[in-house]
């Protein structure tokens, strides 16, 4: 049966399996609803209102569920990976599972395996299944229903892959998928077909070498985005091997890393990692975020280390129904990101992967969010709203309509407040009388 694989020669980050004989979620088949109800050890009580999370919350969680773990161990990213929550039994001891969550774990597992770092688990409300952060990482029964228009590879990345791990869609840049492993799996991941599994998407050093060779043989490639999976689940030495080999290619001008590690595994951003990354400028990092409640002091410290090293930081956010698809939540998110030196970069319409209909919003909601940001806050806070077109069409930007039309040669423009203004549009050059 397929399970997480980092490399053929190293099946997992060292010691990352859950202890006490517990298995991976996608290997653990639960057959009894009653069994799962007995695993739910969280007592019944009113759901508290959770706002800004703090270090004290993580500390309380650690002392309750990992009482023999020192603060030093908790802050070790290897420990966090080894102790991820990856099965129904462990999850049921930490949160009171809803009926939808329970049913999601009965019988065959969904396409996306379960893995949540203890750090990120400490942010999850144990009593409220509608909490935004909880919905992004805990499976529900909705994942098992496939809707019209959904596809395993909606963006046709596999069709645009000349060699394993390389997606070459745009003229001057490539996507380099270097691992299928993530520290925490998002339930709406566009690469649900590959994350956490092996088979055709098992990435290893041999495939890395083929990817490097392809990039070196194509001088039009000036920009390489390392993604996966999450490249920051790799060891420093593995990541440096990739960066060093890319830097040896004269026509590669910039390297980017796409990651959610600063948000779900901030312990990964160590001084040693940052010192290594500084050697490979210009290097950019795109941080995947979903909700303002993710922006804890730990995340702020991780981003500060990266920014202080001269690494420009941008964010990528997927628009998710009932999670961040309102102006107030998105405003808090983009303002919070700017305060920790992360530029809101892209807001993605959720990709139609199988079992994603409960996450996807009408495009009109995304336009409403952008309309509610533009003009009402600084331009630095406004991400570009895009649809990554199904069928491999690439990112297509979407904007609210601000051009009202023309009148007597003037362009009629509607501003953020809904007022219409006239702009004396220049005539075409060949119609100007000299």
Residue ranges and their predicted role:
Residues 1-168:
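Flexible, acidic/Gly-rich N-terminal and inter-domain linker regions that tether
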Residues 120, 186, 345:
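Conserved, mostly hydrophobic/aromatic
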Residues 161-164, 175-177, 209-214:
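Short, charged beta->alpha transition segments
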Residues 168-205, 257:
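Canonical Radical SAM [4Fe-4S] cluster-binding loop centered on the CxxxCxxC motif
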Residues 176-177, 189, 224-232, 255:
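Conserved catalytic-core segments centered on acid/base and nucleophilic motifs
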Residues 188-190, 237-238, 269, 398-399:
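Short acidic, glycine/serine/threonine-rich loops at helix termini
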Residues 208-223, 232-377:
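Conserved AdoMet/S-adenosylmethionine-binding subsite of the radical SAM
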Residues 370-434:
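C-terminal accessory regions of radical SAM enzymes
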């Amino acid at each position: 049966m397929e399970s997480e694989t980092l490399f053929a020669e190293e099946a997992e980050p060292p010691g990352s399996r859950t202890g006490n004989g517990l298995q991976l979620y996608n290997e653990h088949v639960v057959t009894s609803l009653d069994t799962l109800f007995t695993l739910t050890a969280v007592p019944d009580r009113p759901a508290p209102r959770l706002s800004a999370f703090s270090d004290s919350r993580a500390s309380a969680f650690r002392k309750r569920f990992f009482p023999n773990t020192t603060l030093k161990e908790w802050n070790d990213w290897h420990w966090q990976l080894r102790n991820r929550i990856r099965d129904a039994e462990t999850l049921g001891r930490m949160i009171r599972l809803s009926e939808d969550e329970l049913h999601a774990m009965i019988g065959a597992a969904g396409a996306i395996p379960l893995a949540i770092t203890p750090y990120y688990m400490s942010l999850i409300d144990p009593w409220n299944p509608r909490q935004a952060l909880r919905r992004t990482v805990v499976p529900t029964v909705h994942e098992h229903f496939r809707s019209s228009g959904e596809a395993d590879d909606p963006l046709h990345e596999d069709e645009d892959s000349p060699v394993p791990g390389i997606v070459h869609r745009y003229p001057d840049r490539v996507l380099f998928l270097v691992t299928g492993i993530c520290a925490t799996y998002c339930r709406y991941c566009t690469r649900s077909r590959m994350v956490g599994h092996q088979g055709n998407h098992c990435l290893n050093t041999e495939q890395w070498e083929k990817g490097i060779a392809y990039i070196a043989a194509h001088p039009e490639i000036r920009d390489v985005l390392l993604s996966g999976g999450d490249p920051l689940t790799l060891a420093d030495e593995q990541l440096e091997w990739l960066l060093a080999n890319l830097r040896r290619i004269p026509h590669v001008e910039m390297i980017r890393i796409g990651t959610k590690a600063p948000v779900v595994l901030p312990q990964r951003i160590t001084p040693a990692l940052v010192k290594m990354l500084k050697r490979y400028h210009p290097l950019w990092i795109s941080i995947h975020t979903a909700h303002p409640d993710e922006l804890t002091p730990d995340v702020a410290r991780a981003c500060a280390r990266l920014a202080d090293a001269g690494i420009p930081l941008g964010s990528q956010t997927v628009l998710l129904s009932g999670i961040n698809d309102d102006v107030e939540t998105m405003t808090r998110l983009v303002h919070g990101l700017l305060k920790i030196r992360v530029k809101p970069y892209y807001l993605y319409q959720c990709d139609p992967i199988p079992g994603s209909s409960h996450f996807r919003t009408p495009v009109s909601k995304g336009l409403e969010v952008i309309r509610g940001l533009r003009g009402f806050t600084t331009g630095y806070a406004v991400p570009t709203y895009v649809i990554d077109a199904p069928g491999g069409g690439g990112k297509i930007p979407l904007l609210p309509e601000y051009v009202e039309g023309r009148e007597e040669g003037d362009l009629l423009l509607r501003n953020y407040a809904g007022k219409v203004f006239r702009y004396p549009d220049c005539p075409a050059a060949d119609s100007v009388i000299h």
